Design a protein with these regions (language model features):
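Positively charged n-region of N-terminal signal peptides that target proteins for export
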Residues: 1-4
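Short His/Asp/Glu-rich catalytic/ion-coordination signatures at enzyme active sites or charged loops
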Residues: 34-49, 98-117, 139-182, 250-292, ...
Length: 439
């Protein structure tokens, strides 16, 4: 099974194995967490805890904003910008847990909540960034920044805060703000649906093979496919479903399963089938088709950009990037495109030569790329990816990362076992600096 690593930033830092001690009759999000570094007490959190916590978090957040707005003192960095940074603690507490689980260890109930919450959260944040009274306080501080004796860090925070308000529509009139709020809510809803459709199609396809279909596959790849089939058997709810996976081998569009198969399998028909299952996700004219969603999102983004005073969505997004305009992006892409295309054609020619030498009567297609590029690599450089793979096991890669960070920055890692996590395969490390202190 694909291993899961519980990470906060790079690694979740914990320093002891203290267990959660929560009142089971009270929502876990409404209690102080006594776990190391306030690690979420995953075993105590139930799906039904999220919505009440989100609602209370949003209520508290708006109440905190109202306190800032009603402050009769002259707006200052301390009573407005700093206070704004302190708001939303409960909401952030809930959202950090929910967002991570919804993306890494989801279930139908979490997905249902995600669809319900997306427009709610979008509307909530718009209530803050489009609040005229709040923005007026921020704007007054911005206009008086030269005489405020702010540190560089405070200047940066003030600039970023104002920019967030402006780019969210704070300078628009009331009618435009209403339009932006409606558009943001719809985009949020569509974006969630798009992602869930993509996940459903990724998880929904299985290439179930017999032993006779495994031509060219290494022992490691075969073993992983056999284990995947065994896991499917364990999860099966009926005898007929169990029989479906008995003595079989399963490959999926997940890259860790797909790439080794595309590289090693000599069965071109099966390579094509698995490859197409990946590239056609969301484009199968079924209940999880994303074509109409993509069109709707593009139109809404364009409409929002126009309301904000930009020609296109690309112009709006690029304003915050190194390249500021679509023309600058296209110019850079053209510079890269020509040499990249030349190199790609040369690589295809090398692959085609190998296929021709084997007596094949087809032109190299997308699903052939991994297989024949590996053969070219072996012929030209005597480099066998299958021979390297045992050295790149998960544990070896993790240890390599830890050794590198230790050499560069003196960080030390100690795996912790006696702490609750969100999944049985999750692994947790304590991280300390070279002097033994926690970061």
């Amino acid at each position: 099974m694909k291993k899961l690593i519980l990470i906060s930033g790079l690694i979740l830092m914990v320093s002891c194995q203290e267990k959660s001690k929560l009142d089971p009759n009270i929502n876990p999000f409404f209690q102080d967490w006594t776990t190391p570094f306030e690690v979420p007490p995953f075993m105590d959190i139930k799906n039904e805890d999220y919505m009440p916590a989100f609602k209370k978090g949003m209520e508290e957040n708006l109440a905190e904003i109202e306190v800032i707005i009603k402050n009769t003192d002259e707006p200052t960095f301390a009573n407005t910008i700093e206070e704004l940074e302190r708001t939303g603690k409960l909401l952030s507490k809930v959202q950090r847990v929910f967002s991570n689980l919804a993306s890494s260890n989801t279930n139908p109930k979490l997905q249902e909540l995600q669809r319900e919450l997306s427009p709610m959260l979008s509307a909530h944040y718009d209530k803050i960034v489009l609040n005229e009274d709040l923005f007026n306080r921020v704007e007054e501080i911005w206009n008086n920044r030269e005489s405020a004796n702010l540190t560089k860090e405070q200047q940066k925070l003030l600039k970023d805060t104002r920019k967030q308000f402006v780019r969210s529509g704070a300078l628009l009139n009331d009618s435009q703000k209403k339009q932006i709020t409606e558009i943001n809510s719809k985009i949020s809803e569509l974006s969630t649906e798009f992602g869930q459709n993509l996940l459903a199609e990724t998880n929904g396809f299985e290439l179930i093979l017999n032993k006779s279909d495994l031509e060219g596959l290494s022992d490691a790849v075969v073993s992983a496919a056999s284990e995947a089939a065994s896991q499917k058997m364990d999860q099966a709810e009926s005898e007929d479903e169990k029989e479906k996976y008995k003595d079989k081998y399963v490959f999926t569009p997940h890259r860790t399963s797909m790439y080794p198969f595309l590289t090693e399998s000599t069965r071109r028909d099966l390579r094509e089938k698995l490859y197409n299952s990946y590239v056609m996700r969301g484009d199968n004219a079924n209940e999880t088709d994303n074509n109409d969603i993509a069109v709707q999102m593009a139109k809404l983004r364009a409409e929002r950009a126009n309301i904000m005073g930009y020609k296109t969505h690309a112009d709006f997004i690029l304003e915050e990037n190194m390249l500021k305009t679509p023309d600058e992006v296209y110019d850079l892409l053209i510079q890269l495109w020509k040499p990249a295309l030349k190199r790609a054609k040369a690589e295809v020619a090398d692959m085609q030569a190998v296929a021709d030498s084997e007596g094949k009567d087809f032109k190299i297609a997308a699903w052939d790329w991994w297989h024949y590029s590996e053969k070219v690599r072996k012929d030209k450089y005597d480099l066998d990816e299958a021979a390297i793979r045992p050295y790149l096991s998960l544990d070896n890669v993790i240890q390599g990362v830890f050794n590198t960070t230790n050499k560069l920055w003196g960080l030390n890692f100690k795996e912790i076992f006696d702490i609750d996590s969100y999944h049985p395969d999750a692994r947790i490390w304590e991280v300390t600096d070279k002097d033994g202190s926690h970061l």
